[in-house]
Amino acid sequence: MLQQQLTTLLAQTNIALTEKQQQQLVRYVELLTKWNKAYNLTSVRLPEEMMVKHIMDSLVVAPHLPGHHYIDVGTGPGLPGIVLAIALPNTHFVLLDSLGKRVRFLMHVKHELGLDNVTPVQSRVEEYQPSVKLDGVLSRAFASLQDMVDWCGHLIDHSGKFIALKGVFPSEELESLPTGVKFEQKIALEVPNLDAQRHLIILSKD
């Protein structure tokens, strides 16, 4: 049932996934549903809702990530990082969260799905020092743009990007950006079967 739902949703996008990738996404939803009962990882309880509100909502970002190394800050149960790692197997994602239960779940998902391109890390973002040069910092429902820039500025250099997944276009947040950061691009995202606005906001160091 989940497989059929995913196939139907994908048909409404330009995203092409292999059968293996689709199976990995379905298995991820199954694992999230199972672990959620004990660990309370997401307020979305039904797997059919997760497929739209979590999987597709994250997946539509994949075509807009040209780099090879990203960090997903405040990843929670792996959103968008796990989904993007499945869709982009040649891109590496550090999945950062401060809560041990979330990181334990991510380690289980990594092992269960054979995701060699993810590195779950338990740490506060302010204390984390990347071991490789990162192309971008990803955040979804993590913080305001100003907080994201303040907390994550040490993770990238001038060639890196701040990439925020937002709902309604955050015009007020953009007006209060700190000096040294510039707004580069906004991308309106279409999420199948989701009746809500979604925007990708891309910032860089000035």
Swiss-Prot record:
<keyword id="KW-0963">Cytoplasm</keyword>
<dbReference type="GO" id="GO:0070043">
    <property type="term" value="F:rRNA (guanine-N7-)-methyltransferase activity"/>
</dbReference>
<feature type="binding site">
    <location>
        <position position="140"/>
    </location>
    <ligand>
        <name>S-adenosyl-L-methionine</name>
    </ligand>
</feature>
<dbReference type="InterPro" id="IPR029063">
    <property type="entry name" value="SAM-dependent_MTases_sf"/>
</dbReference>
<feature type="binding site">
    <location>
        <position position="79"/>
    </location>
    <ligand>
        <name>S-adenosyl-L-methionine</name>
    </ligand>
</feature>
<dbReference type="GO" id="GO:0005829">
    <property type="term" value="C:cytosol"/>
</dbReference>
<protein>
    <recommendedName>
        <fullName>Ribosomal RNA small subunit methyltransferase G</fullName>
        <ecNumber>2.1.1.170</ecNumber>
    </recommendedName>
</protein>
<keyword id="KW-0489">Methyltransferase</keyword>
<comment type="function">
    <text>Specifically methylates the N7 position of guanine in position 527 of 16S rRNA.</text>
</comment>
<dbReference type="InterPro" id="IPR003682">
    <property type="entry name" value="rRNA_ssu_MeTfrase_G"/>
</dbReference>
<keyword id="KW-0698">rRNA processing</keyword>
<keyword id="KW-0808">Transferase</keyword>
<feature type="binding site">
    <location>
        <begin position="125"/>
        <end position="126"/>
    </location>
    <ligand>
        <name>S-adenosyl-L-methionine</name>
    </ligand>
</feature>
<dbReference type="Pfam" id="PF02527">
    <property type="entry name" value="GidB"/>
</dbReference>
<comment type="similarity">
    <text>Belongs to the methyltransferase superfamily. RNA methyltransferase RsmG family.</text>
</comment>
<feature type="binding site">
    <location>
        <position position="74"/>
    </location>
    <ligand>
        <name>S-adenosyl-L-methionine</name>
    </ligand>
</feature>
<keyword id="KW-0949">S-adenosyl-L-methionine</keyword>
